[in-house]
From Swiss-Prot:
One of its GO terms (biological process) is translation. One of its GO terms (cellular component) is ribonucleoprotein complex. This is Large ribosomal subunit protein uL5. Belongs to the universal ribosomal protein uL5 family. InterPro entries: Ribosomal_uL5, Ribosomal_uL5_bac-type, Ribosomal_uL5_C, Ribosomal_uL5_CS, Ribosomal_uL5_dom_sf, Ribosomal_uL5_N. It comes from Microcystis aeruginosa (strain NIES-843 / IAM M-2473). The gene is rplE. PROSITE patterns: RIBOSOMAL_L5. The keyword Transmembrane helix does not apply.
Amino acid sequence: MSQKLKTTYQETIVPKLKEQFGYTNIHQVPKVIKITVNRGLGEASQNAKALESSKAELSTITGQQPVVTRAKKAIAGFKIREGMPVGVMVTLRGDRMYAFLDRLINLALPRIRDFRGISGNSFDGRGNYSLGIREQLIFPEIEYDKIDQIRGMDISIITTAKNDEEGRALLKEMGMPFR
């Protein structure tokens, strides 16, 4: 697996952020803890094939088996009962997380049509970043002929940053293409 981003973080990003924010200890420097990739499927309760294809796509993209998320409450308007499958999600940590982030930044995001950079407004106030993707075709692992329907996904990058400024600086140094 590609360790390029991890070594870049340890060798160049940590000293740069330590100097920029005036940290005394390297453990104060913000780092990425985990990345969650989530896909909500409204039709999963009626269509089991959509759930299986989504599981296969997410495991191809992330390299890890996704878990099926189930409805916590029954919602009559959406024809959902408690315990019905409503989506799939993957939590990435460690080496897989760095490999996925590297592929996302360098391969997937530049393949988005009319891409001019991602919004810098999607931070949550605690240094975590959320990103919505409209189609799975931007990942080179997905073959156009094999997909049954274009579906998006939500990607959340959870960091140890104390505020949005630190989180933005960390992701910018990692190469995240902000506008």
